[in-house]
Amino acid sequence: GVPCAESCVWIPCTVTALLGCSCKDKVCYLD
């Protein structure tokens, strides 16, 4: 549930996705 400082409104999580972040409510989150 920690914001990863990357949005996913128009494109999916990219750099932060490699760290385990996923898209939730238009923002990339880690747990």
From Swiss-Prot:
The keyword Acetylation does not apply. Disulfide bonds join 4-21, 8-23, 13-28. There is a cross-link at residues 1-31 (Cyclopeptide (Gly-Asp)). Contains 3 disulfide bonds. One of its GO terms (biological process) is defense response. Keywords: Disulfide bond, Knottin, Plant defense. The keyword Disulfide bond applies. InterPro entries: Cyclotide, Cyclotide_bracelet_CS, Cyclotide_sf. Belongs to the cyclotide family. Bracelet subfamily. Probably participates in a plant defense mechanism. The presence of a 'disulfide through disulfide knot' structurally defines this protein as a knottin. This is Cyclotide cter-C. It comes from Clitoria ternatea (Butterfly pea).
